């Protein structure tokens, strides 16, 4: 099995437990783009349909923007910001936490983070 196949099996196993809270650490890190999108859509739909709390640890901020209702930023192991995705994902918050200048652009009604050099 490839790393991506193993990761999909682990996610499926977690979903069969029928827990009310699901915590996934980098659930899409070993998946190709198609399966990243599918997995995040499935998780979001399951959360809505089953009143499930899904906590995902993601380093890809564009996926976080697209699929999260709320965002929590950690800095030096402590909570730096928590709240609605649209309020937390700002150029100043990204600069403070990651020391990176970004632009947030909108395309087809979705926000995307573009790092600036």
Regions found by a protein language model. Give the residues of each.
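Conserved catalytic motifs of ABC-family nucleotide-binding domains
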Residues: 18
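Helical segment within the ABC ATPase nucleotide-binding domain
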Residues: 36-49
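ABC ATPase "signature
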Residues: 82-84
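A short, surface-exposed alpha-helical micro-motif characterized by mixed small hydrophobic
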Residues: 64-66
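ABC ATPase nucleotide-binding domains
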Residues: 97-117
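Catalytic Walker B motif of ABC-type/P-loop ATPase nucleotide-binding domains
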Residues: 22-26
């Amino acid at each position: 099995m490839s790393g991506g196949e193993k990761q999909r099996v682990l996610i499926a196993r977690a979903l069969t437990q029928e827990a009310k809270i699901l915590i996934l650490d980098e659930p899409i890190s070993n998946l190709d783009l198609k399966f990243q999108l599918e997995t995040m859509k499935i998780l979001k739909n399951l959360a809505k349909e089953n009143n499930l709390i899904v906590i995902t640890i993601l380093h890809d901020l564009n996926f976080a923007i697209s699929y999260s209702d709320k965002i929590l930023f950690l800095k030096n192991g402590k909570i730096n910001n928590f709240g609605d995705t649209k309020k937390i994902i700002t150029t100043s918050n990204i600069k403070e936490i990651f020391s990176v200048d970004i632009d947030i652009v909108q395309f087809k009604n979705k926000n995307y983070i573009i790092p600036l050099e």
